[in-house]
């Protein structure tokens, strides 16, 4: 992966290139930004430049190994969980073949996409102490090619505290010519100590224009590319899903529609609470990552409804794919209730992530929603 393959982010690419040219390579760097902004592919492209040099044609063997994600001095850490194949102490090294396939398919893919690809979507993958112990061994060995050794830690916010503390010891006294590239979508979940040890590189959401151009280069029509880019609000992974019709939006929309209809019905018919009980029970049977994705989808849809209600149609990207009357629904979302609804959804998300009882969490959220939808 080369800098020219990265969508947008020109200023950051130029800054990284200049720093490398002048020999300024901080041993610990943190690439962070929202979903689909390209932080992981950018980190890989930067690692390639550090390992192989700036001229692609001058070291073709090295560049080929990096492009195949098989360079012996390039190491990856990413969230995993025990699976049918690896029942105990699963670490990233166990999943490298799947990881390579995953990245070659779409380097902008999400954590949820990764979990789906290795069959752990019903679990909460993490980066644990065993993972870091394995990395410490690798980074302590002599470089295969006599140059740099690079570790890319994807979704660093998934590191537990013991793993973070163990890795900090390595970062504070790093072996010579070792480079740690952390990639995060939620910098607030990282410890202050870890952040303070890294040079921070913030990526912004991608512009619709940049994404549209990239999609056209991939062979999609201008109309398809433009529509997908506007809908995906800076997330290139979502744009790719829109043009390839792989997005879970229709399923989530159906869940959302059933949910809010039952919530509205409770005011006129108390027995409709039973529908919310059934709805909560059904969604609690899905994986936690699916539940969190649905909550994120719902939060975005409530915010889109607020824009619609205030006649800001030019900022609204949502278009129903079912019989959902979006315009009528949006009349119930205003400045009087959007903050409270957002807080409840974010709290539910946090509780799901903390392994709370999802059935109770969704039932509690549903009952609160019946009140908040009618708040004047």
What role is predicted for each listed range?
Residues 1-68, 176-179, 185-297, 301-376:
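Charged, glycine-rich active-site and insertion segments that engage polyanionic ligands
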Residues 2-158, 162:
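Clamp-loader machinery-focused feature within the broader ASCE/P-loop NTPase space
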Residues 137, 169, 196:
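Conserved adenine-binding aromatic site and its adjacent loop/helix in ATP-hydrolyzing domains
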Residues 140, 165-176:
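Conserved catalytic/switch belt of AAA+ P-loop NTPases
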Residues 150-154, 167, 178-184:
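Structural recognition of the conserved hydrophobic beta-strand(s) that form the central parallel beta-sheet
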Residues 159, 168-172, 289-292:
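Short, surface-exposed loop and linker segments with low hydrophobicity and enrichment for Pro/Ser/Thr
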């Amino acid at each position: 992966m080369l800098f020219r393959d990265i969508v947008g982010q020109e200023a950051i690419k130029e800054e990284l290139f200049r720093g490398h040219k002048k020999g300024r390579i901080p041993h610990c760097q943190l690439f962070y930004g929202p979903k689909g902004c390209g932080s992981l592919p950018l980190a890989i492209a930067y690692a390639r430049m550090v390992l192989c040099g700036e001229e692609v044609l001058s070291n073709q063997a090295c560049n080929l190994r990096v492009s195949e994600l098989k360079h012996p001095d390039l190491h990856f850490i990413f969230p995993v969980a025990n699976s049918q194949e690896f029942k105990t102490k699963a670490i990233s090294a166990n999943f490298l073949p799947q990881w390579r396939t995953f990245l070659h398919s779409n380097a902008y893919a999400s954590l949820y996409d990764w979990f789906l690809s290795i069959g752990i979507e019903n679990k909460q993958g993490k980066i644990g102490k065993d993972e870091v112990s394995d990395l410490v061994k690798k980074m302590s060995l002599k470089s295969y090619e006599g140059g740099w050794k690079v570790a890319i830690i994807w979704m660093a916010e998934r590191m537990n505290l013991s793993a973070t503390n163990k890795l900090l010891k390595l970062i504070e006294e790093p072996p010579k010519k070792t480079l740690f590239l952390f990639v995060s979508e939620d910098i607030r979940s990282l410890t202050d100590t870890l952040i303070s040890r890294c040079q921070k590189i913030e990526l912004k959401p991608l512009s619709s224009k940049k994404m549209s151009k990239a999609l056209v280069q991939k062979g999609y029509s201008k109309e398809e590319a433009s529509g997908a880019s506007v809908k995906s609000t800076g997330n290139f992974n979502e744009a790719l899903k829109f043009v390839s019709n792989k997005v879970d939006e229709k399923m989530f929309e159906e869940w959302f529609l059933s949910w809010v209809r039952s919530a509205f019905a409770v005011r006129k018919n108390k027995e409709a609470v039973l529908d919310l009980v059934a709805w909560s029970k059904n969604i609690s049977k899905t994986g936690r990552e699916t539940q969190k994705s649905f909550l994120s989808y719902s939060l975005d849809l409530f915010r889109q409804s607020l824009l619609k209600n205030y006649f800001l149609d030019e900022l609204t990207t949502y278009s129903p794919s079912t019989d959902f009357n979006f315009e009528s629904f949006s009349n119930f979302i205003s400045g009087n209730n959007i903050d409270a609804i957002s807080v409840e959804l974010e709290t539910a998300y946090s509780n799901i992530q903390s392994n709370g009882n999802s059935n109770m969490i969704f039932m509690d959220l549903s009952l609160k929603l019946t009140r908040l939808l009618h708040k004047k």
